Amino acid sequence: MARTKKVGITGRFGARYGRKAKRSVKMIEENMKKNHVCPRCDRPYVKRQAAGIWKCRKCGAVFTGGAYVPETPMAKSAARNIRNVNVEE
């Protein structure tokens, strides 16, 4: 196996594909594979099942989200806007 101190999770690609592509893949995959917080039980046990399908290993909740993160930046923005509208009323 190749050394992966600098390249991390993308060490499996070896000398192929170039630095820029591997850097973006590394950023996406590290963010995808970390533990995310469950919206139901608020514990960091959410793992990706498939593209856009996420499951909490603690409470068993299955929900949809982004392909690489359970809550996309647009979803966060929409939730914030809804909260602001409800506060104003």
Swiss-Prot record:
Zn-finger (C4-type) residues: 38-59
One term of GO molecular function: zinc ion binding
GO biological process: translation
Pfam families: Ribosomal_L37ae (PF01780)
Keyword line: Metal-binding, Ribonucleoprotein, Ribosomal protein, RNA-binding, Zinc, Zinc-finger
UniProt keyword annotation of Transport present: no
Cofactor needs: Zn(2+)
Gene Ontology cellular-component annotations: ribonucleoprotein complex; ribosome
UniProt-listed InterPro entries: Ribosomal_eL37/eL43 (IPR011331), Ribosomal_eL43 (IPR002674), Ribosomal_protein_eL43 (IPR050522), Ribosomal_zn-bd (IPR011332)
Source taxon at top rank: Archaea
Co-factor remark: Binds 1 zinc ion per subunit.
Similarity field: Belongs to the eukaryotic ribosomal protein eL43 family.
UniProt protein name: Large ribosomal subunit protein eL43
Protein species of origin: Methanobrevibacter smithii (strain ATCC 35061 / DSM 861 / OCM 144 / PS)
